[in-house]
């Protein structure tokens, strides 16, 4: 077993520096494409829900792909939306908290806006026509049923307010508390706090068929079971082909003293219970008798067991496979360290999780002792096993378990071994950035060169990262961040995400908004085959005319795509021609001697490295430009200060990604001698020359400051402004010559067009 000790602050810092590059030093960790909220709207790949207002807190989503609809739980509202367009045929139910409950909530010291309202936290499909719904009810949770039509076209959408019931142990009191629930066979499984203060947490089962109500919960008297648990997700997952073995798996984090120190730490867990658990006969009555839990580890292995841990579980996503018993488990974790802030994504297999639950139990003599492996005799049937006729015909229910099985599981709910990632460590990390990961969804995508899991990650600042982990030679992993998308106008904590593979859309909720986002924006990568291949997006391929959505086809090499290496030379027939003939955009730039000029070059990819080359006038060879005090390289181009005559020539801006180098733009710089400008100015009359020189000096100084401070302000725009200014000055200069004629025209117009005046009296 690997050591699970928590490194001290110094070792954490050194490990962070060892494993994780400082921001800005690794081009590969930078998102290749960064799109703003405005960019997404212009690309028609983002649809914000227009029915939202600030503070509605869109935290709960229920996706119904079969009928093409999305149920959204928010503050005092439940929305029924169209999956194709969130703003089409919107229906809503207004369900506020009772006024007396709101007053009691405020008297208890809670905030009137963020606490004392009815925040919808449960939306679970009960049957074909009804959805079970629960809201916090201003710290007095309530539950009920929403009636829906069975078909998409039906307009039924109403809450049965006559049959509301208490939501205690089904829904949290606090709207901000992490919470998980799932409906299975008409039973509601929920992990939540059972009291107003949120100290007592429990995993419960309620509801059920009318003839078979069996309320079950965790044992509050056993502190080994749960300690300050924060539930993240829960899922029904079959273990075998025998339905009697079906289990509910739940993922959470809790306070623990698993380490060798006396300090309390937060650890992530995976737990499970049997679906057919009925509680005990003489002990653990109406309590789980099959409750087990194990540690879920997401860490970077370090020297001598000093691993760098990401201990706080934030979200879980199950990626379905062909075998429903073995989905892949994707988890988002964050650090608890005060030394550095980081997030990671780890992947687990159900086979590894089951192996831990079938392994040794942990034992603790008392609260002052450490957890050790239990070496004693394990009672029969094995604690945690579901009762099944095929396993033992004499044990038909958990109420038939022997007393020693019940006693054992009360004291030994924790497994000794931990569950480790399938790949040995995280498949994705974010370190030394100003945000943390909060949500995850994953899509399994078929590409030309293989199959890839595309990961979509929500952050606490309202951005979505689109990434892919690529397996290279010798099973090494390459982490590629394809896009960083600002999906909200203002930074906002992303609290929920759902994916529709049928619609190829993400649905993302936060405190201040709800957004529908396309999984791909192939056209934004560029208009050339090379741009499409360099993107390495499994969704996109070059079809001969444009970068568009890839669809598997039987035609050999019908689409150009290279996710694994991103090599356009091997995929695009026109690349060699474009390299040899340099088919990049070409512009002519004019600069004035001794002034500054800016050569603009903005690569589409943030992962590209830029190099500048110059071919001076009258010379055959090119040389690479080196930055110095006069030549300054910026993210948006090249600033040349105190322009010299020898600076004239052709400037080539070249971008390199991986081994592929191509010219983005060619700029032909012409330097106008300062003497030419002076001789032109001497032809003007003395008065105008002095006035214009004073004005021009001030304006050029302003323009120079603007040019230096804003690299995005191109020299072309500067020259255009100068040209318009000169034209206006010339018009004003010649205006006096025609002043007399213009005055005569005005008099004539007044004489011909003045209305007749009434006679004076």
From Swiss-Prot:
The gene is SEMA3D. The keyword Secreted applies. Residues 1-24 form the signal peptide. Strong binding to neuropilin is mediated by the carboxy third of the protein. Induces the collapse and paralysis of neuronal growth cones. Could potentially act as repulsive cues toward specific neuronal populations. Binds to neuropilin. GO terms for biological process: axon guidance; negative chemotaxis; neural crest cell migration; positive regulation of cell migration; semaphorin-plexin signaling pathway. Coiled coil: none annotated. It is found in: Secreted. GO terms for molecular function: chemorepellent activity; neuropilin binding; semaphorin receptor binding. GO terms for cellular component: extracellular space; plasma membrane. Residues 552-670 form the Ig-like C2-type domain. It comes from Gallus gallus (Chicken). InterPro entries: Ig-like_dom, Ig-like_dom_sf, Ig-like_fold, IL-1RAcP-like_ig, PSI, Sema3D_Sema, Semap_dom, Semap_dom_sf. Developing spinal cord and developing visual system. Collapsin-1, -2, -3, and -5 bind to overlapping but distinct axon tracts. Residues 728-761 are annotated as: Disordered. Disulfide bonds join 105-116, 134-143, 274-386, 298-346, 522-540, 653-719. Residues 728-754 have a biased composition (Basic residues). Residues 32-519 form the Sema domain. Belongs to the semaphorin family. It holds the Pfam family Ig_6. This is Semaphorin-3D. Keywords: Developmental protein, Differentiation, Disulfide bond, Glycoprotein, Immunoglobulin domain, Neurogenesis, Secreted, Signal. Glycans are attached at residues 127, 595.
């Amino acid at each position: 077993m690997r050591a699970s000790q928590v490194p001290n602050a110094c070792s954490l810092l050194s490990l962070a520096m060892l494993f994780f590059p400082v921001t800005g030093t690794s081009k590969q960790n930078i998102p290749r494409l960064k799109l703003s909220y405005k960019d997404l709207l212009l690309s028609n790949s983002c649809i914000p829900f227009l029915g939202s207002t600030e503070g509605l807190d869109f935290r709960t989503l229920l996706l119904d792909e079969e009928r093409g609809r999305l149920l959204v739980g928010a503050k005092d509202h439940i929305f029924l939306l169209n999956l194709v367009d969130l703003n089409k045929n919107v229906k809503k139910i207004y369900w506020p908290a009772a006024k007396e409950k709101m007053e009691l909530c405020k008297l208890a010291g809670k905030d009137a806006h963020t606490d004392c309202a009815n925040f919808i936290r449960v939306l679970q499909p009960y049957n074909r026509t009804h959805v079970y719904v629960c809201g916090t009810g201003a710290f007095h949770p309530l539950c009920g049923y929403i009636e829906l039509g069975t078909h998409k076209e039906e307009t039924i959408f109403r809450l049965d307010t006559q049959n509301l019931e208490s939501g205690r142990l089904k829904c949290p009191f606090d709207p901000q508390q992490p919470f998980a629930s799932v409906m299975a066979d008409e039973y509601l499984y929920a992990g939540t706090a059972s009291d107003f203060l949120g100290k007592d947490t429990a995993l419960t089962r309620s509801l059920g068929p009318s003839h078979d109500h069996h309320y079950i919960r965790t044992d509050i008297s056993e502190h080994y079971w749960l300690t300050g648990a924060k539930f993240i997700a829960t899922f029904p997952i079959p273990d075998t082909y025998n339905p009697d073995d079906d289990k509910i798996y739940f993922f959470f984090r809790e306070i623990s003293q698993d380490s060798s120190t006396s300090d309390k730490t937060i650890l992530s867990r995976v737990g499970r219970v049997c679906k057919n658990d009925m509680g005990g006969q003489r002990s653990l009555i109406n309590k789980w008798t099959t409750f087990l839990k194990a540690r879920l580890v997401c860490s970077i292995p370090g020297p001598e067991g000093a691993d760098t841990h990401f201990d706080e579980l934030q979200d879980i996503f199950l990626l379905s496979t062909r075998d429903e018993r073995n989905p892949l488990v994707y988890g988002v974790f964050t650090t608890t360290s005060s030394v550095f802030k980081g997030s990671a994504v780890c992947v687990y297999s159900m086979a590894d999780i089951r192996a831990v639950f079938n392994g040794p139990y942990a034992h603790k003599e008392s609260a002052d002792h450490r957890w050790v492996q239990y070496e004693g005799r394990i009672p029969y049937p094995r604690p945690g096993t579901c009762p099944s006729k095929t396993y033992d015909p004499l044990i038909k229910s958990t109420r038939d378990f022997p007393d020693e099985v019940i006693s054992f599981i009360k004291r030994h709910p924790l497994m000794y071994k931990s569950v480790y990632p399938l790949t040995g460590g995280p498949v994705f990390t974010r370190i030394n950035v100003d945000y943390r990961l909060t949500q995850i969804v994953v899509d399994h995508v078929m590409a030309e060169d293989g199959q890839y899991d595309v990961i979509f990650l929500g952050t606490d600042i309202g951005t979505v990262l689109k990434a892919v982990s690529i397996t290279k030679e010798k099973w090494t992993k390459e982490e590629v961040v394809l896009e960083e998308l600002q999906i909200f106008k203002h930074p906002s904590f992303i609290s929920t995400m759902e994916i529709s593979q049928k619609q190829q859309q993400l649905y993302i909720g936060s405190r201040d908004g709800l957004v529908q986002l396309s999984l791909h924006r192939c056209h934004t990568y560029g208009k050339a085959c090379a741009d499409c291949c360099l993107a390495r997006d499994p969704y996109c391929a070059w079809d001969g005319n444009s970068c568009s959505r890839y669809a598997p086809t039987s035609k050999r090499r019908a689409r150009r795509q290279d996710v694994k290496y991103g090599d356009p030379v091997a995929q695009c027939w026109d690349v060699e021609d474009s390299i040899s003939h340099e088919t990049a955009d070409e512009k002519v730039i004019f600069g004035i001697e001794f002034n500054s000029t800016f050569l603009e070059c903005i690569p589409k990819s943030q992962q590209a490295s830029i190099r500048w080359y110059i071919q001076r006038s009258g010379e055959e060879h090119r040389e690479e430009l080196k930055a110095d005090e006069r030549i300054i390289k910026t993210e948006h181009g090249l600033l040349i200060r105190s322009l010299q005559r020898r600076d004239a020539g052709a400037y080539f801006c070249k971008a390199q990604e991986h081994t592929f180098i191509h010219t983005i733009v060619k700029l032909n710089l012409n330097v106008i001698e300062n003497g030419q400008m002076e001789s032109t100015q001497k032809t003007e009359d003395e008065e105008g020359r002095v006035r214009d020189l004073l004005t021009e000096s001030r304006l050029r100084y302003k323009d120079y400051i603007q040019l230096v401070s804003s690299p995005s302000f191109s020299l072309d725009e500067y020259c255009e402004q100068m040209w318009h200014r000169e034209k206006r000055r010339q018009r004003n200069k010649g205006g006096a010559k025609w002043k007399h004629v213009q005055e005569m025209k005005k008099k004539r117009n007044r004489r011909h067009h003045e209305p007749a005046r009434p006679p004076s009296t």
